[in-house]
């Protein structure tokens, strides 16, 4: 896959959010009259597109009848040996930057604390957070 595209109400706030996850802006451009960029990190690439007159996104995580985009998933198997500790560190990082820049950052919204899940013959640690527009992001780490 080349990239996943995310529409955002505020591209500058979204860039700052994804930078805290380890992404960096690789290209900035416009699509028509809207601001856009590609960001690379966590072994993937995302595209952020600012929407001039945004409407609230559906609750893809909470509405079990919702059809469409559900979440992006990032494999942290190579990045950490302990997903709960990694997530706690991320929460602290967001808490600190929210103090310094309250207009740009909110405390990290955790949708699902780390839990173990068996999928096929593997056991994973899985956690979900929400991005700045409330879109669910999954972090997964293979344990075996």
Kindly label every feature range from the protein language model.
Residues 34, 53-60, 113:
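A short, acidic/glycine-rich surface segment
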Residues 7-46, 52:
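Core segments of cupin and vicinal oxygen chelate
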Residues 51-53, 142-143:
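Acetyl-CoA-dependent GNAT
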Residues 44, 77, 139:
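Residue-level marker of positions within ordered structural domains that often coincide
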Residues 44-47, 56-57, 134-135:
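Short, charged/polar, Gly/Pro-enriched secondary-structure boundary elements
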Residues 1-10, 28-30, 37-40, 59-144:
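Vicinal oxygen chelate
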């Amino acid at each position: 896959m080349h990239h996943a595209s995310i529409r955002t109400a505020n591209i500058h706030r979204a860039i700052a959010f994804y930078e805290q996850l380890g992404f960096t802006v690789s290209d900035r451009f416009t699509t028509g009259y809207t601001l856009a960029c590609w960001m690379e990190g966590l072994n993937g690439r995302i595209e952020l597109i600012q929407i001039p007159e945004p409407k609230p996104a559906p609750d893809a995580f909470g509405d079990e009848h919702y059809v469409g985009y559900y979440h992006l998933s990032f494999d942290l198997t190579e990045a950490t040996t302990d997903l709960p500790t990694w997530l706690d560190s991320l929460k602290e990082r967001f808490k600190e930057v929210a103090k310094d820049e309250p207009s740009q950052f909110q405390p990290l919204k955790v949708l699902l604390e780390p839990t173990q899940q068996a999928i096929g013959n593997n056991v994973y640690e899985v956690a979900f957070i929400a991005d700045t527009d409330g879109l669910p992001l999954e972090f997964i780490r293979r344990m075996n």
